[in-house]
């Protein structure tokens, strides 16, 4: 019995050591499924339509193809073709045909498709990475920062900056760092979109910027974009390191050994 357990354990360790790292990654769910959009019943017509096609030629005493005493093709006592007590063709208690019990035509239908629900995983992911700005093509808005103290080389510009720094942005727009090859590209894109968006928004409110304002704004935003890049890079590498750590063969062996001790 002990040799059998030892042999099984050696086989498990061998398989775990050579297992593909890709198995640790979460596979995307296939598309489709229940309540994923589209018509669940593509072959159905409107609920108020005829459930049976009209039949030509009736029997004895049928002027328009119905039963005995049916002037317009319905059941007994049906003036316009419906079930018992149906004046215009429908189910019992249906005044104008079609639908289930208590349904007048297309009004008050049962089993309506439910409204699509918000995917909370996507909401949580967006909240963790930053607020996604829909009108800016996938850019995210970073958290608020303290405006840096910058010296511009002259007393006039330094004083002007201290007096007007509250008019400059304290948040930057950016894309995920994995979409850029280096820090310079990230910062360049971050500065351009942030200055442009802030200028347009502020100008719409009736406030204009001078050339001095634009110059200082670019310097301020550049420093904040560098800070944002450092934050995002650190978080990105930490996530990558965690994935590599838990998918390495030694860690898999250790976890398998602990599971064996607990179960055995």
Swiss-Prot record:
Annotated segments matching region Disordered: 28-119
GO biological process: protein homooligomerization
Keywords: Amyloid, Cell membrane, Copper, Disulfide bond, Glycoprotein, Golgi apparatus, GPI-anchor, Lipoprotein, Membrane, Metal-binding, Prion, Repeat, Signal, Zinc
Residues reported to bind Cu(2+) 2: 80-82
One Pfam assignment: Prion
Positions of Cu(2+) 3 binding: 88-90
MF terms (GO), sorted A to Z: copper ion binding; G-quadruplex RNA binding; identical protein binding
UniProt-annotated stretches for the region 6 X 8 AA tandem repeats of P-H-G-G-G-W-G-Q: 54-103
Signal peptide annotation: 1-24
InterPro entries: Prion, Prion/Doppel_b-ribbon_dom_sf, Prion/Doppel_prot_b-ribbon_dom, Prion_copper_b_octapeptide, Prion_N
Segments of skewed composition (Gly residues): 55-107
Family note: Belongs to the prion family.
The record's note on its domains: The normal, monomeric form has a mainly alpha-helical structure. The disease-associated, protease-resistant form forms amyloid fibrils containing a cross-beta spine, formed by a steric zipper of superposed beta-strands. Disease mutations may favor intermolecular contacts via short beta strands, and may thereby trigger oligomerization.
Protein name (database record): Major prion protein
Organism lineage: Eukaryota, Metazoa, Chordata, Craniata, Vertebrata
This protein's encoding gene: PRNP
């Amino acid at each position: 019995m002990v040799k059998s357990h030892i042999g099984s354990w050696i086989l498990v360790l061998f398989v775990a050591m050579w297992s593909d790292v890709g198995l640790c990654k979460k596979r995307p769910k296939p598309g489709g499924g229940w309540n994923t959009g589209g018509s669940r019943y593509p072959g159905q017509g409107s609920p108020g339509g005829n459930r049976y096609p009209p039949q030509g030629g009736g029997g004895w005493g049928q002027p328009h193809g119905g039963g005995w005493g049916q002037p317009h093709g319905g059941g007994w006592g049906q003036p316009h073709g419906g079930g018992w007590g149906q004046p215009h063709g429908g189910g019992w208690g249906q005044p104008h045909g079609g639908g289930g019990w208590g349904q007048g035509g297309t009004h008050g239908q049962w089993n309506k498709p439910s409204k699509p629900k918000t995917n909370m995983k996507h909401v949580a992911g967006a909240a963790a990475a930053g607020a996604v700005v829909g009108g800016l093509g996938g850019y995210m808005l970073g958290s608020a920062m303290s405006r840096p103290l910058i010296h511009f080389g002259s007393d006039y510009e330094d004083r002007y900056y201290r007096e007007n720094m509250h008019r400059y942005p304290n948040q930057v727009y950016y894309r995920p760092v994995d979409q850029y090859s280096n820090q310079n590209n990230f910062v360049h894109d971050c500065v351009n979109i942030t200055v442009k968006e802030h200028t347009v928004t502020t100008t719409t409110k009736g406030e204009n910027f001078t050339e001095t304002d634009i110059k200082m704004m670019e310097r301020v935003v550049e420093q904040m974009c560098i800070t944002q890049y450092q934050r995002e890079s650190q978080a990105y590498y930490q996530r990558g390191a965690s994935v590599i750590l838990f998918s390495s063969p030694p860690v898999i062996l250790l976890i398998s050994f602990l599971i064996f001790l607990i179960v055995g």
